[in-house]
Structure formats: structure tokens, C-alpha cells
Amino acid sequence: TAQWDGRIMREHPEWLAVDENGEFIDTQGVPAPHFYHTICLNSGYRQFFKDQLQDMIEVIGVENLDGIFMDILFQVDCKCEHCVRKMQELGMDTESKVERMRYAEHMLDEFKTEISEFIHSMAPEATIFYNGSHVGPRSKNSFKEYSHLELESLPSGGWGYDHFPATSRYARNLGKEMIGMTGKFHTYWGDFHSLKNQAALEYECFHMLAVGAGCSIGDQLHPRGVLSKGAYDLIGNVYKSVEEKEPYCRDVKARTEIAVITPEEFYPEDAKDSVLSPSLIGTVRILQELGYQFDIIDSQMP
């Protein structure tokens, strides 16, 4: 997790993002104690993060490394001394939230470029993905740094059942291999005591296959440090059925008859980019229920 780290939060408060009032930023609204104070990627943490990556690659060994998935990377309305200085160097208005969010997007793109170059200098064949819980037009400029796309979307965990149908129909037009990502949990990440019912998990995975995506079912290691047999029995049962369908789902391209322009492209710069507009949700529902094959596009797509 790139921008959440409990140890960093405790030991290096000078690396944390702060809002316009000088308060640490907690985007999750979780009561203390927690580890959700967001880290600023403009701070000394960036070198610490690169040192961690280098140590990990050296310990694992390049020959054993498939790829690196970096989680929790998103725009933050940060007004720390590092961001203020960089904005001033670019002639940007540090008192404007719109300008701060515009700079946050620029800085995040620049961070991804630097980290991808750093990783590939040591592990040229490693796959790379930066997860911000959503794949949409706002992140499009940085997708050149991704080897593939992973669409995190837990229907019962905050994303809802409308998120994946819309996002996948946009992401499949970006020229990257695409994987759908759900979880084995009944609700959200970290819901350790629960298992999603098999029918729901099958629906999610079969939906991934139907839109041309691979399947990923996420888990987290229980604090006891032992994998849950029940979880992997569940996942195994679902993947057994997925395996039977895989020969028909490789190297596929959707044959669509309708294109819908996403309003995300035109959101205000200070708007949250992971929230789908009601108009898009309604359009996707109607077209799905009528049985049409369609894509979600932006204005730059052919």
C-alpha cells in the first residue's frame, strides 16, 4: 500500500499529506487508532518507497518476480510544504482547490513514471500495476506506465453492482490486457470471518469473462497467519467452472453496436473520480437489460 502505512504515520508525520487547514488527511473517516492518514508522495517518503522496492526485488530475486502491484494511489488535495513549493515552481495557485487537485494529478502521473522506470531498471520484464480503486479517463495519461489493467470492484464492498459493468466496458478499449478483481469476502476487504456465497462469486467471475476480462478473487491473510481452507474451497469451486470456459474466453474482442460517452471525462477537476454518475449508471442498466452490446468510450477514442 503506497499511501497508507501505519509505521510511517507514527514515525514520520512530516511525510503525511495535510489539508488547507494543516490537518492530516484521512479519506476513510475511520476513528483512531488507524493507519489511514494519507502519505504525500512528494515528501521524503518517495525515496523510502524506492528503497523498499529495491530491497524487495533483491530479496525475491528478479528471476522469481512476476510483477509488482502497488495499491492505494490516488489524488489528494494536499497543501504540505513539499506540494506548495512544487506548485509555486510551476506558477500554480496554492490557494485554489481546483489547482491543487490539478497538481495532484500531475504529480501522481510523474510519480508513476519515475517508479516504473526504477522498477524496470532492475526487473525489465516485471508487470506493473498502480491501483486507485477505479480505472477511468482521469488516470488515462498514466496508463502507459501500466503493463495491464486490474479493475477492483467488490459489489458488496462499496463499489456496488453498477461499477464493474460500466468500468469494464470503458477499460477494454484502452489497449491493455484487463483483469476483473473482486474478493472472497461477504462485504469488504478485511471481513475475515465471512465468505461470499458461491452463486454471487460465480456471477462476478462469469461477468468478467463475458466482458473479455480475466478473473482475480482477492483474499487477505488472516492475522493468525494461516490461509482459510473454507476460502480456498470456495475459490477453487468457482475457478473450476471458470477453467471450463477459459478456452472460449482468450484473446476475445467485444462486438458492439452502441458507444456511450462517459461523463467522467467532463467531471470538475476537484470531483471524486471513482463515483459513477447516475446518468451513466442508468444508461448501462437500460442497455444491459435490453440485451444490447455496447462500449463506454471517451471523446478521444476512435
Predicted regions and their residues:
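Active-site neighborhood of glycoside hydrolase catalytic domains
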Residues: 41-145
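Aromatic- and acidic-residue-enriched segments that line the glycan-binding/catalytic groove
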Residues: 2-32, 70-95, 146, 275
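Carbohydrate-binding surfaces of carbohydrate-active enzymes
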Residues: 97-137, 142-302
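Active-site-adjacent "subsite" loops/lids of carbohydrate-active enzymes
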Residues: 2-60, 98-101, 112-113, 300
